[in-house]
A protein has these predicted regions:
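Short beta->alpha junction loops
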Residues: 49-56
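A short, Lys/Arg-enriched amphipathic alpha-helix followed by its capping loop at the start of a domain
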Residues: 36-45
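Catalytic nucleophile-elbow at a beta strand-turn-alpha helix junction centered on a G-D-S/GDSL motif
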Residues: 20-34, 83-85
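Sec/Tat signal peptide C-region and signal peptidase I cleavage site
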Residues: 12-16
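Bacterial N-terminal signal peptides
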Residues: 1-11
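Residues that form or flank phosphate/diphosphate-binding pockets in enzymes
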Residues: 32, 58-59
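Alpha-helical cap/lid subdomain in secreted, periplasmic
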Residues: 18, 43-44, 59-213
Length: 213
């Protein structure tokens, strides 16, 4: 019995090692959909998320090498934006010190574009297939983010991706179609479990297509 158990564990480990390796980099939105992506791609790929929250693109530049590590990634699906376009004020009582009236913008769109250009240049060195995910929707009433800034920052990101020939997964378009009930609350950028599953479907599809290329 013990021998059989050990054999089954060993075979399972070898099988997992033979699967393509996928890295998802992003903020809490991607943390929300990664488990469903991993479940959808079970048996087809090993899906991992960078440790913790990737926050803004400046943080991404600082921590990217650590997140990539020495792993030979087959696909890297990555996103920044919601933290970059957020306004914060140290005296704000709202979670995350968000305050789009009196706060300071985390990353200008010009700096964001420059940061992404540097990030993509580094990611290309991995030889992984790269997929950029457009930033999801900023809803009306968000305390630290302005409606429409998601479009502006996504346009900047798209310029970078076109320059480098990187595939774009338009999660902004996906989330724009969501009913109010798929957001955790009015004025909140986060999604319910059902909303995250819908995003996961788009992410899984993009990764599957990349693996088949």
């Amino acid at each position: 019995m013990l021998v059989l158990l050990l054999c089954s564990v060993f075979v399972g480990t070898v099988h997992a090692q033979d699967l393509p390796e996928v890295l998802i980099i992003g903020d809490s939105i991607s943390i929300g959909y990664t488990p469903a992506v991993a479940a959808e791609l079970e048996g087809k790929a090993v899906v991992r998320h960078n440790p913790g929250n990737a926050q803004d693109s400046g943080t991404g530049l600082k921590k990217l090498d650590r997140w990539i590590g020495t792993e030979q990634w087959d696909v890297i699906h990555f996103n920044w934006g919601l933290w970059d376009l957020c306004y914060r004020h140290p005296q704000s009582k709202v979670q995350g010190n968000r305050d789009k009236v009196n706060g300071t913008l985390t990353t200008s769109v010009e700096q964001y574009e420059q940061n992404l250009d540097e990030i993509v240049s580094r990611l290309k060195k991995t030889n992984a297939k790269l997929i950029w995910a457009h930033t999801t929707t900023v809803p009306e009433g968000e305390a630290g983010r302005k409606v429409g800034d998601d479009t502006i920052y996504n346009e900047a990101a798209e310029r970078v991706m076109i320059k480098h020939g990187i595939a774009v997964n338009d999660l902004n378009q996906v989330s724009d179609s969501f009913a109010a009930g798929l957001f955790v609350a009015p004025g909140n950028v986060h999604f319910t479990a059902e909303g995250s599953k819908k995003l996961a479907a788009a992410v899984s599809n993009a990764i599957s297509n990349a693996l088949q290329e």
